[in-house]
Amino acid sequence: SIRRQRQMCIRDREKLIDSNQEAKRLMGELGVGLISTEQFCDAARNLTLTTVSNHQIIEAANRMLVVIPDEKKRRLLKLKAKGYRLFLLSNTIDIHWDYCVEKLFPYQGHNVEDYFEKVFLSQRLHLSKPDARIYEEVIRQAAIVPEESLFIDDLQENCVAAENLGIHTFQNVEFDDWLDLEL
């Protein structure tokens, strides 16, 4: 009957919403290091009712990553050569970070250590942007003066959180807006 089909559709929709919320929760927990990559992969298999390997899950997760244009890497190298202290603060997971280090950052013999003095990752700090504590930790570990620092991020909420601590910000709305900054 139509009523039974409608009820089945509603149940299926609710399951889909629940599984989507569960996936977001898992990514959030992985993103701040509350669960390991192995635990994440196990949960992903349970959620999707599949028997795929950890390697297959990691490959699928990394497909969402985009190229870092050479122009950006050249600009980072130039800024560092000018004496700017460059740090990277990223809400990322080790799965993605390992891929970025291996595949996206290498450029003409350079690697991630050549661009940044230090890298701060949410999964390793057990905090994520826009939580003020992650910025405070970067300020402390990097020994930077907020009023003399510029934070570039694509999300307004992350910029606002940094501004609240006295850090100058630039919201990078388009993929490469920050390249136009006069530094």
Question: Would you name each region that the model predicts?
Answer:
Residues 93-94, 101-183:
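Asp-based, Mg2+/Mn2+-dependent phosphohydrolase catalytic module
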Residues 5, 25, 39, 43, ...:
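Alpha-helical elements of Rossmann-like donor-binding domains used by nucleotide-donor carbohydrate transfer enzymes
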Residues 26-30, 76, 116:
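Generic hydrophobic alpha-helical segments
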Residues 36, 64-71, 130, 134:
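Soluble or luminal CAZymes and related metallo-dependent hydrolases
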Residues 54-106:
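Substrate-recognition element of Asp-dependent hydrolases with the DxDx(T/V) motif
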Residues 1-10:
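Single conserved hydrophobic/aromatic residue that forms the stacking wall/gate
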Residues 24-58:
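A metal-dependent, Asp-based hydrolase signature
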